[in-house]
């Protein structure tokens, strides 16, 4: 990877501009979309109950979360939620892995859970799998990424940003990127609030960033 600093435009093109707070309103989401268009972010990421947006999205893509934030929903419920979101205009779905199955080492069931959602998110729609890396060992991170790849997912993602153990770390992103080897994208999310941290995640192998502090992050980029 080049050591040249990322410009605001380059970084914005990697950002899912995110609003997932429970109290978010439709007016808040309308502002989110307006800001995403202004900054040139790749997408906005919102809760599925906000769909359909019925907004002029311009070039901004639409992502939604699924099984969020616990991942403890049944596979059928996750798949139904994803299917409804796609029908309502979502182009990308960020699902949460079942951490209980991960901790029990039930990798076939982990894979099946992801595969059930992927069936509801057919290509060229994008499925990202949130593995909640802060609560996993490095071996569990590797196995979770392998399960996501086997199930046909398009990205692995560090975190919901809602777990008390924390969000993305450079170390976890490196493990994830090494595991998927460019075959899947890697999304870092949770706790990325400034330009330096965002660039560190990209340097570690992240190809997408989930952030809510987009304006602050881009303000730290060198002048173009």
From Swiss-Prot:
The gene is deoC2. This is Deoxyribose-phosphate aldolase 2. It catalyses: 2-deoxy-D-ribose 5-phosphate = D-glyceraldehyde 3-phosphate + acetaldehyde. Its main location: cytoplasm. One of its GO terms (cellular component) is cytoplasm. GO terms for molecular function: deoxyribose-phosphate aldolase activity. It holds the Pfam family DeoC. Belongs to the DeoC/FbaB aldolase family. DeoC type 1 subfamily. The keyword Cytoplasm applies. The lineage of its organism: Bacteria, Bacillati, Actinomycetota, Actinomycetes, Propionibacteriales. InterPro entries: Aldolase_TIM, DeoC, DeoC/FbaB/LacD_aldolase, DeoC_typeI. It comes from Cutibacterium acnes (strain DSM 16379 / KPA171202) (Propionibacterium acnes). Catalyzes a reversible aldol reaction between acetaldehyde and D-glyceraldehyde 3-phosphate to generate 2-deoxy-D-ribose 5-phosphate. Transmembrane segments: none annotated. Keywords: Cytoplasm, Lyase, Schiff base. Pathway: Carbohydrate degradation; 2-deoxy-D-ribose 1-phosphate degradation; D-glyceraldehyde 3-phosphate and acetaldehyde from 2-deoxy-alpha-D-ribose 1-phosphate: step 2/2.
